[in-house]
UniProtKB/Swiss-Prot annotation:
Interacts (via C-terminus) with UL16. It comes from the Viruses. Keywords: Host cytoplasm, Host nucleus, Virion, Virion tegument. It is found in: Virion tegument; Host cytoplasm; Host nucleus. This is Tegument protein UL21. Residues 251-279 are annotated as: Disordered. It comes from Human herpesvirus 1 (strain 17) (HHV-1). InterPro entries: Herpes_UL21 (IPR004936). The lineage of its organism: Viruses, Duplodnaviria, Heunggongvirae, Peploviricota, Herviviricetes. Belongs to the alphaherpesvirinae UL21 protein family.
Length: 535
């Protein structure tokens, strides 16, 4: 859901986002957005609230909302009355934090820190270490948009692990309020005195404010007496100025038609990605072309025929890369993705697809073009994409990468690990060192130089089991027994529940992390093989 604004102003230490007509101002509080309308004559302006609400563990229960209400009462916050009878907005969850005394303490904050272990488990469906950060929105200053998430981003404060939200706990909602919470009322008093009122035309229609719906569901309107309204007053009908407008994504960029079937006679369009206005990211159809035909296109004895000199070099380069990384079908090399029943070139295609999808530089488009040239020359029919096969391949490599990175993050949380003699090969040791350094460089709050030989050895132990194709949980269990860090098993179990196709900010963050880890492992492997250091 998106709310647009024209300008910002600072008033009483609050950032207000003022709409184009200057009759409405938004402000952020504890992951939610409050909207205040300009008073008219003696009538106060419309007050509304947008954001995530917590509900229950199933489609028809309100366990989580009731838990928050109960905790608020036990902590003596009787004056806090969450809106509605069933849901509790995210900013009320803030009040369970012992460091927060009222909504005033979470003004201008997009997220909520949850220290309550029971509530954190409700939100993530997992036992977590204390401290998760739940983000309900972001302000896109370059677009002048306040974006409210349909699904929150939940991150562990200590490990930075990104969780998938429980499916029934959160929902996007909007509510009409009779007044603001008492702690916030003084912040908006006199706000519009400093904002010039626009001159209304004589034939002015009733004002409206568009709320752009970008998710699959429109925010649920909540009818209630409002936060801190002081008792259950008489219900009355209200007419809101807000109008929900559904945003429909364009199927593809302007001027781009879907990729033609392989037997199309137009040679210029037969090669996926050859159009001048190609989409910025790879498509599953392109991956399927490579997945289906790469072994024939690059491995056949006469695969080089009819190609330019540069294309011949590219074909040989891809064959060499696939062998250096993954070996051959008869003699697979110990590396990530070993448990996948794929050929080396298929693994390479999925590897580059995941990296390229996150806008990182990769030769995936060149690989697609080469395979397209082959299917064009030989009239090879490529069937419709097998989505389950592609999903299994992508998720397998995606989860392997995330599991390796998550294990490195968990190990780096410990300055001292038990010294043990853990035999690790030179390739695995190089991978382990590179991955730890990459993750350490991303942890800005932690000073550098904390990577020890034990960190390298134990991550190497994890990678050795993973590279042998024995599975992520086997690798986590083996490493947990060596180190005594049992949280590794839980963390990798969390990874196994993630998908490369998860929606929302959390899914995007996981894909970015996985692509980064794969990029690091690819770089160090190819660099070592180029210098003849691979063992």
């Amino acid at each position: 859901m998106e709310l647009s604004y024209a300008t910002t102003m600072h008033y009483r230490d609050v950032v207000f986002y003022v709409t184009t007509d200057r009759n409405r101002a938004y402000f952020v509080c504890g992951g939610c957005v409050y909207s205040v309308g300009r008073p008219c004559a003696s009538q106060p302006g419309e007050i509304a609230k947008f954001g995530l609400v917590v509900r229950g563990t199933g489609p028809d229960d309100r366990v989580v909302a009731n838990y928050v209400r109960s905790e608020l009462r036990q902590r003596g916050l009787q004056d806090v009355r969450p809106i509605g009878e069933d849901e509790v907005f995210l900013d009320s969850v803030c009040l369970l934090n012992p460091n927060v005394s009222s909504e005033l303490d979470v003004i201008n904050t997009n997220d909520v820190e949850v220290l309550d272990e029971c509530l954190a488990e409700y939100c993530t469906s997992l036992r977590t270490s204390p401290g998760v950060l739940i983000s309900g929105l972001r302000v896109r200053a370059q677009d002048r948009i306040i974006e409210l998430f349909e699904h929150p981003t939940i991150v562990n404060v200590s490990s930075h692990f990104v969780y998938t939200p429980s499916p029934y706990v959160f929902a996007l909602a909007q509510a009409h309020l009779p007044r603001l919470p008492s702690s916030l009322e003084a912040l908006v008093s006199g706000l519009f005195d400093g904002i010039p009122a626009p001159r209304q035309p004589l034939d002015a229609h009733n004002p409206r404010t568009d709320v752009v719906i970008t998710g699959r569901r429109a925010p649920r309107p909540i009818a209630g007496s409002g936060a801190g309204s002081g008792g259950a007053g008489a219900k009355r009908a209200t007419v809101s100025e807000f109008v929900q407008v559904k945003h429909i994504d364009r199927v593809g960029p302007a001027g781009v038609s879907p990729a033609p079937p392989p037997n199309n006679t137009d040679s210029s369009s037969l090669v996926p990605g050859a159009q001048d206005s190609a989409p910025p990211g790879p498509t599953l159809r392109e991956l399927w072309w490579v997945f289906y035909a790469a072994d024939r296109a690059l491995e056949e004895p006469r695969a080089d025929s009819g190609l330019t000199r540069e294309e011949v070099r590219a074909v040989r380069g891809f064959r060499e890369q696939a062998w250096k990384l993954f070996g051959s079908a008869g003699a697979p090399r110990a590396f990530i993705g070993a448990a996948l029943g794929l050929s080396p070139l298929q693994k390479l295609a999925v590897y580059y697809y995941i990296i390229h999808r996150e806008r990182r530089l990769s030769p995936f488009p060149a690989l697609v073009r080469l395979v397209g040239r082959y299917t064009q020359r030989h009239g090879l029919y490529v069937p419709r994409p097998d989505d389950p096969v592609l999903a299994d391949a992508i998720n397998g490599l995606f989860r392997d990468a995330l599991a390796a990175g998550t294990t490195a993050e968990q190990l780096l949380m410990f300055d001292l690990l038990p010294p043990k003699d853990v035999p690790v090969g030179s390739d695995v040791q190089a991978d382990s060192t590179a991955l730890l350094r990459f993750i350490e460089s991303q942890r800005l709050a932690v000073p550098g130089g904390v990577i020890s030989p034990e960190h390298v050895a134990y991550l190497g132990a994890f990678l050795s089991v993973l590279y042998a194709g024995r599975g992520r949980m086997s690798a986590a269990t083996h490493t947990a027994r060596l180190t005594g860090v049992t949280s590794l098993v839980l963390a990798v179990g969390d990874v196994d529940r993630l998908s490369a196709f998860d929606r929302g900010a959390a899914g995007a963050a996981s894909r970015t992390r996985a692509a980064g880890y794969l990029d690091v492992l690819l770089t160090v492997r190819l660099a070592r093989s180029q210098h003849g250091q691979s063992v």
